[in-house]
């Protein structure tokens, strides 16, 4: 049973399927993650499994986190993540979550922080068209009109303008696991995932499997 796992993005490559077609893939080093806490309905009001991933030096972790990990008898970890479960049977405190809990062909959702691009303009951030480059125009990469004058006399909230681009947590849904390498803790996932190489990823079973519903909910 796969509840979820934390991993590190290694980069992108290509994978050849049975027909010899090159498929773009992402290599993810996932786990092994130790189970650091079990939450039950009796003690916490819901059932969940908390896992830890990544090494950290003792001087860089605070006392509350150190005490929390000491209860489970686990080594210090850099990242903690919690997953809701319906049943805690067969899950033990101190156990390991590995890539072997997943299967080739399984659909997963991958969450991570997108690459930060700093302060960006309208063309790069929102894909706006630029202004004329010749004939005396000075409006090359400026936003142009951003609203009316007297009415409403203000800029509506949510207006697309320049600002910070990237560095947000997003989820890419319905990616397919093409291959699993248990010896090297690798997941080969079809397509791209958020973040740059070395960034933290959260991989969990897809909660939307199947064809998209038709418009109107029918």
From Swiss-Prot:
GO biological process: translation
GO molecular function: rRNA binding; structural constituent of ribosome
Record keyword DNA-binding present: no
GO cellular component: cytosolic large ribosomal subunit
Top-level taxon: Bacteria
Matching Pfam families: Ribosomal_L3 (PF00297)
Signal peptide: none
Listed InterPro entries: Ribosomal_uL3, Ribosomal_uL3_bac/org-type, Ribosomal_uL3_CS, Transl_B-barrel_sf
Disordered: annotated segments: 126-163
Keywords: Ribonucleoprotein, Ribosomal protein, RNA-binding, rRNA-binding
Keyword Chaperone: no
Function field: One of the primary rRNA binding proteins, it binds directly near the 3'-end of the 23S rRNA, where it nucleates assembly of the 50S subunit.
HAMAP family per the UniProt record, alphabetical: Ribosomal_uL3_B (MF_01325_B)
Family assignment from sequence similarity: Belongs to the universal ribosomal protein uL3 family.
NCBIfam families (UniProt xref): L3_bact
Subunit structure: Part of the 50S ribosomal subunit. Forms a cluster with proteins L14 and L19.
The protein's name: Large ribosomal subunit protein uL3
Provenance organism: Synechococcus sp. (strain CC9311)
Lineage: Bacteria, Bacillati, Cyanobacteriota, Cyanophyceae, Synechococcales
Gene encoding the protein: rplC
């Amino acid at each position: 049973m796969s509840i979820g796992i934390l991993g590190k993005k290694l980069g992108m490559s290509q994978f050849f399927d049975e027909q010899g077609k090159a498929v773009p893939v992402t290599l993810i080093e996932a786990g092994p993650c130790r189970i650091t806490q079990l939450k039950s309905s009796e003690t916490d009001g819901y059932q969940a499994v908390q896992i830890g991933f990544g090494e950290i030096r003792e001087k860089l972790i605070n006392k509350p986190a150190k005490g929390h990990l000491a209860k489970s008898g686990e080594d210090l970890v850099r990242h903690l993540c919690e997953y809701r479960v319906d049943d805690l049977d067969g899950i033990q405190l101190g156990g390991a979550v590995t890539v072997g809990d997943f299967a080739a062909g399984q659909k997963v959702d991958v969450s991570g922080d997108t690459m930060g691009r700093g302060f960006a303009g309208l063309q790069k951030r929102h894909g706006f068209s630029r202004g004329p480059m010749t004939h005396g125009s000075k409006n090359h990469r400026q936003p142009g009109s951003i609203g009316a004058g007297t009415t409403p006399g203000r800029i509506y909230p949510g207006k697309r303008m320049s600002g910070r681009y990237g560095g947000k947590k997003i989820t890419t849904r319905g990616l397919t696991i093409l291959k699993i390498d248990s010896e090297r803790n690798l997941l080969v996932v079809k397509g791209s995932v958020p973040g740059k190489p070395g960034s933290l990823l959260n991989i969990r079973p897809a909660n939307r499997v199947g064809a998209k519903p038709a418009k109107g909910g029918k």
